[in-house]
């Protein structure tokens, strides 16, 4: 196991740089005090002689201490003096490192006299730490941190600095103890179809599991690229999922891609229509790596374009983008100045004008003074995976995950554990939308290895999984059945938590995709916001069993508001033969109430309708009662009574479909609002 010491030179400086720390304390060691009272005259005489540097050399003084300890093995002061002599001599001889010869004397000192001082606990804990005996390091470093005394001298000369070092060593030691005791299940296998005899890496699988994007290294004579001058060429490649559940062998990305010798590290929005990836180009100051984007319009990719000067630095490395589920936050790695260390993870948000803002550093919770890279934000938009050589780990780069709390604050990163993380560099990790499968790139010798670098998958243990997520895909139509075009917002609200998120909308085709978290079986309501558009919503019940990662919503018809127009409010249901609203219907009405309050100048009439089953008179009465129930619910949610002109039932007198079929009758059983004034 590779030990990643944050700065071993600082540790040694803290231990041994000042002669006051060790050597001078030899003369200050007292018998008795808080420790044992020694009555052995010969032992006391030898102890005193061991402190006389002028009369005796180091070997003689050591011999006197050995005789004293032999006579009184539990004598704490003598044992401590011996430990300090050993460490001081080692430093004088230029032998900075671990000092196993001192450990038994330090241990005898603190075990027989815990009040002897704080420093021996620090030295002992540090020695165990440097020897990778993390279990014992935890014990003695914790005792150093917890050392309680009113005597400042017993805390030592460098207590403030040593305390900060001890806390850091304690953090790492606890990590190593924990990771050793929690070996994670790990049975990786190659991803069929993607992996070939060639190298495949920098891979990502789209959230809907239909496509894979990666770099494939191939011989130059197959690459057919004039810019290739080496024996191998890196080609940006895409594979598609086949009906048998395997990816095809992949094809090179056509124009506008593969025009540069270094392209890849891609990410796609959840509708698979907006791609972000990395290109290295020659700049005025040499090669420069930046993030670029392209959009899929009518089956073809638009010309690639830079994310712009706000995001891309003209000098520094900007790479490895990953996009959030709503398409509005992009995370990436960069070595630009202004961060916490070397390579940091940054984020940029898309404004209402569609432009990306100035990047923000993820801060010291995620980034360290070393390097963090290879970020992957899961489709749940609240679980971030990344690689780091700064957080406690076992290799060069280890994989970590962090979760955002309800306020958006990122929690302390967690190491993914062994054997997932190795003593090498572990990067390029991502997770399936349902959260159950982890993916990574490796050229290690793993059972089933196909080529050099391959893409592997494995079942991710539950604690490290993101919240299971599905993608809701739908079509927005205008009142004539044509694709809804122009600026449109798809809002998704968690009924139970009230949390809001947004879908990705194609303003040309009217299609949309939205991510919803389904682990907690919460209900969601989708509402559409567009200038001068009538209220429209669709309820997605968390009680249903989701098969696969894609849920197809019913097409949503968005009508333009017109005075006199009647608009159905979807998902308004009542108890059988009663005017009692179902709980999920109250959610819809709460959203409709918010819509009305956003348009205070709007005045409406609520209308209730039934099918033709049953008595005509009873249907009329029931529709009246139900329309009034809707009116009461809206006023309960804060809609002024003056905004609702009336609530009236029409029974079965105004059908909009054929009552001869169940589907027709279902359409006729409806609640509408009619626009009276706008």
Segments (PLM) and residue ranges:
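Periplasmic peptidoglycan-binding/tethering modules of Gram-negative envelope proteins
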Residues: 36, 463-603, 640, 677-678
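Short, conserved micro-motifs composed of acidic
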Residues: 29-38, 116-119, 123, 130, ...
């Amino acid at each position: 196991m590779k030990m990643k010491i944050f700065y071993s030179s600082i540790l040694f400086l803290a231990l041994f740089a000042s002669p006051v720390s060790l050597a001078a304390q030899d003369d200050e060691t007292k018998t008795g005090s808080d420790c044992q009272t020694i009555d052995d005259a010969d032992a006391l005489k030898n102890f005193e002689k061991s402190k006389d540097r002028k009369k005796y050399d180091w070997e003689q003084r050591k011999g006197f201490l050995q005789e004293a300890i032999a006579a009184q093995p539990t004598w704490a002061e003598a044992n401590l003096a011996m430990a300090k002599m050993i460490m001081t001599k080692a430093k004088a001889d230029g032998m900075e490192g671990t000092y196993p010869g001192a450990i038994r004397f330090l241990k005898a000192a603190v075990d027989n006299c815990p009040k002897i001082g704080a420093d021996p606990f620090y030295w002992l804990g540090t020695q165990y730490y440097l020897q990778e005996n993390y279990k014992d390091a935890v014990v003695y470093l914790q005792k150093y941190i917890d050392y309680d005394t009113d005597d400042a001298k017993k805390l030592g000369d460098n207590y403030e600095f040593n305390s900060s070092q001890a806390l850091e060593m304690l953090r790492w030691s606890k990590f190593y103890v924990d990771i050793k005791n929690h070996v994670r299940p790990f049975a990786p296998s190659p991803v069929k179809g993607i992996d070939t005899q060639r190298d495949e890496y920098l891979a990502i699988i789209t959230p809907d599991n239909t496509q894979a994007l990666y770099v494939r290294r191939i011989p130059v004579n197959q690459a057919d690229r004039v810019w290739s001058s080496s024996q191998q060429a890196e080609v940006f490649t895409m594979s598609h999922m086949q009906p048998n559940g395997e990816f095809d062998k992949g094809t090179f990305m056509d124009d506008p891609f593969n025009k540069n010798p270094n392209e890849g590290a891609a990410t796609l929005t959840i509708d698979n229509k907006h791609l972000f990836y990395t290109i290295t180009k020659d700049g005025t100051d040499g090669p420069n790596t930046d993030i670029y984007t392209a959009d899929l319009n009518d089956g073809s990719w638009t010309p690639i374009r830079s994310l712009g000067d706000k995001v891309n630095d003209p000098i520094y490395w900007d790479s490895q983008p990953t996009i959030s589920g709503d398409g509005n936050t992009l995370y990436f790695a960069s070595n630009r100045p202004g961060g916490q260390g070397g390579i940091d993870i940054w984020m940029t948000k898309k404004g209402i004008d569609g432009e990306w803002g100035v990047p923000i550093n993820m801060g010291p919770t995620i980034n360290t003074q070393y390097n963090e890279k290879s970020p992957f934000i899961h489709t749940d938009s609240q679980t971030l995976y990344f690689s780091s050589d700064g957080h406690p780990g076992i290799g060069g780069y280890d994989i970590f995950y962090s979760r955002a709390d309800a306020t958006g604050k990122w929690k302390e990163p967690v190491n993914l554990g062994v054997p997932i993380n190795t003593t090498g560099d572990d990067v390029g990790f991502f997770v399936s939308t349902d959260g159950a499968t982890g993916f990574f790139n490796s050229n290690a010798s793993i059972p089933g290895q196909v080529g050099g670098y391959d893409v592997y998958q494995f079942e991710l243990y539950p604690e490290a999984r993101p919240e299971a997520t599905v993608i809701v895909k739908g079509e927005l139509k205008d009142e004539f059945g044509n694709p809804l075009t122009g600026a449109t917002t798809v809002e998704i609200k968690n009924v139970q938590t009230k949390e809001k998120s947004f879908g990705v909308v194609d303003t040309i085709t009217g299609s949309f995709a939205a991510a919803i978290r389904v682990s907690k079986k919460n209900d969601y309501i989708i509402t559409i916001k567009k200038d001068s558009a009538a209220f429209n919503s669709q309820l997605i019940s968390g009680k249903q069993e989701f098969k696969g990662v894609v849920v197809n919503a019913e097409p949503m018809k968005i009508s333009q508001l017109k005075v006199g127009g009647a608009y159905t409010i979807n998902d308004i249901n009542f108890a059988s033969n009663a005017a009692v609203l179902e709980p999920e219907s109250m959610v819809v009405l709460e959203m409709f109430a918010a819509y009305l309050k956003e348009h205070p100048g709007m005045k409406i009439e609520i209308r209730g309708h039934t099918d033709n089953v049953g008595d005509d008179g009873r249907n009329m009465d029931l529709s009246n009662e139900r329309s009034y129930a809707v009116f009461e619910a809206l006023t309960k949610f804060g809609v002024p009574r003056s905004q609702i002109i009336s609530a009236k039932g029409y029974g079965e007198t105004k059908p909009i479909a054929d009552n001869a079929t169940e589907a027709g009758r279902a359409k006729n059983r409806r609640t509408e609002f009619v626009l009276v004034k706008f």
